[in-house]
């Protein structure tokens, strides 16, 4: 699809050539290292992606009772850490297979990844078809629309508001780096919590998430507690939901939470359920395989989102390359900003925590990130290029917005606009008994949501300003998403 040269290599051939016929995950690395050596430094010939087309189990030899019933021919191997008993420090890592430097592999916590790695956790032809079809359909982008301009950030309560603080910080960071995306925040503690004989729940949060999942989003990002069977103690979204989702607009799910996708186990889990759901779920899943530290999850979450939304030479990074670069960022020290003196602020993680993160999906697939820019030329005939002028929207008036697609005068298609009111300070409810109420800023009021045509790269639309607006001098926000008629060019 993207002009890649692809090698399809049966696992048994790799074992024969690189591990003396014995099934060994190291054979995958040695094969990639051979390709790297043969490239002799020529970037065009270097191996870039490894798609592990097959599920795996922690018992690579399949000697235990749970694994004896499985057919080894239906599975690939995985790399398990030497410490395999501690839930926090043990890990399964596909990224290890992409560490190709001379003498590397023995200390993966401090070593950089050379090849982007992802996995299709499939063991039957039916499962394989599901993931292949999902990937092809996503790349063909038949369901393209403004839903692909939405990033939803979700955060659990508890832990002295840690998860909500982290999610809010990451969301604000991404909004600053990529202001053209529409950011939505769902903080558990901002909603009413109900209690019954089976425990606590957040019905409104569940409704909002399921509604967004049905409508679609580019990324659904969650920070908080989790297990293989549920997100948060309140079971806001459960394994059964991921099995039953019916949505054609497939997001990338990202979870900065414990144990969401232990794909080397024999029990069902949310990560695999999301990508193997034939009727919806996710096009790919980026999450953790074991218990992780919440304070370090923020580092990985921020680094991955920054990379996966970025572009290079006018093209979005692939999800596998984003994973590789994010992992390497935390080894080198990720620069997330600068202090008042201009010195870089960095985040690093040389622990096994970052190795808990894995990608279920095609590493060579990019997200459908818009690559062109939509420019607002004027609001109510007041030019946006005039810094001294300020367009005021008043309740009951008809507002007009004119704009164009930058660098493409031949663009014909549709533009979708979402106009939101000024930011509001939201104070949470302290449902979990925290000493201080968590507060965050969000845009909760939508003034207009609609579409209009783009002709010759230009557009204009009007809308009536509602009466229940925030009566302040603070700025509103216009998010725009445009797609051409043959659905091959996107802008925001």
Model-derived features: positions:
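Cysteine-dependent hydrolase recognition
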Residues: 1-464, 472-474, 482-491
């Amino acid at each position: 699809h993207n002009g890649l040269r692809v090698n399809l290599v049966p696992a048994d051939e790799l074992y024969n050539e690189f591990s003396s016929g014995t099934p060994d995950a190291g054979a995958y690395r040695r094969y990639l290292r051979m390709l790297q050596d043969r490239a002799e430094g020529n970037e065009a010939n270097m191996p870039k992606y490894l798609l592990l087309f097959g599920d795996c189990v922690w018992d690579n030899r399949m000697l235990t009772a749970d694994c004896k019933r499985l057919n080894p021919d239906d599975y690939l191997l995985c790399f398990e850490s030497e410490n395999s008993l501690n839930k926090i420090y043990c890990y399964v890592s596909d990224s290890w297979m992409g560490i190709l430097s001379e003498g590397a592999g023995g200390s993966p916590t401090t070593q950089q990844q050379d090849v982007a790695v992802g996995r299709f956790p499939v063991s039957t032809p039916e499962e394989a078809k599901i993931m292949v079809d999902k990937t092809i359909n996503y790349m063909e982008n038949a369901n393209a629309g403004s839903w692909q301009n939405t990033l939803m950030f979700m955060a659990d309560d508890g832990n002295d508001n840690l998860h909500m603080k982290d999610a809010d910080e990451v969301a604000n960071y991404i909004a600053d780096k990529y202001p053209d995306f529409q950011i939505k925040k769902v903080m558990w503690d901002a909603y009413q919590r109900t209690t019954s004989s089976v425990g606590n729940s957040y019905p409104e949060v569940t409704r909002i998430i399921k509604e967004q999942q049905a409508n679609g989003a580019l990324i659904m990002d969650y920070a908080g507690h989790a297990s293989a069977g549920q997100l948060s103690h309140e079971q806001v979204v459960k394994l059964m939901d991921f099995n039953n989702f019916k949505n054609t607009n497939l997001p990338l799910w990202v979870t900065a939470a414990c144990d969401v996708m232990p794909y080397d186990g024999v029990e069902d889990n949310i990560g695999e359920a999301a990508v193997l759901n034939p009727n919806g779920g996710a096009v790919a899943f980026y999450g953790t395989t074991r218990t992780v530290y919440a304070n370090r999850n923020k580092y990985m979450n921020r680094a991955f989102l920054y990379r996966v939304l970025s572009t290079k030479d006018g093209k979005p990074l692939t999800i596998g390359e984003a994973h590789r670069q994010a992992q390497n960022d935390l080894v080198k020290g990720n620069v997330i900003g600068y202090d008042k003196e201009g010195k870089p602020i960095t985040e690093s993680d040389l622990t096994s925590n970052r190795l808990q993160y894995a990608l279920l999906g095609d590493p060579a697939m990019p997200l459908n990130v818009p690559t062109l820019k939509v420019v607002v030329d004027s609001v109510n005939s007041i030019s946006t290029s005039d810094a001294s002028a300020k367009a005021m929207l008043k309740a009951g008036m008809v507002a007009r917005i004119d704009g164009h697609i930058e660098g493409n005068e031949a663009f014909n298609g549709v533009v979708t606009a979402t106009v939101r009111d000024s930011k509001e300070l939201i104070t949470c409810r302290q449902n979990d008994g925290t000493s201080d109420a968590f507060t965050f800023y969000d845009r909760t009021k939508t003034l207009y949501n609609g579409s209009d045509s783009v002709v010759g790269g230009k557009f204009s639309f009007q809308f009536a300003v509602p009466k229940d607006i925030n009566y302040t001098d603070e700025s509103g926000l216009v998010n725009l998403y445009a797609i051409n008629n043959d659905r091959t060019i996107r802008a925001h």
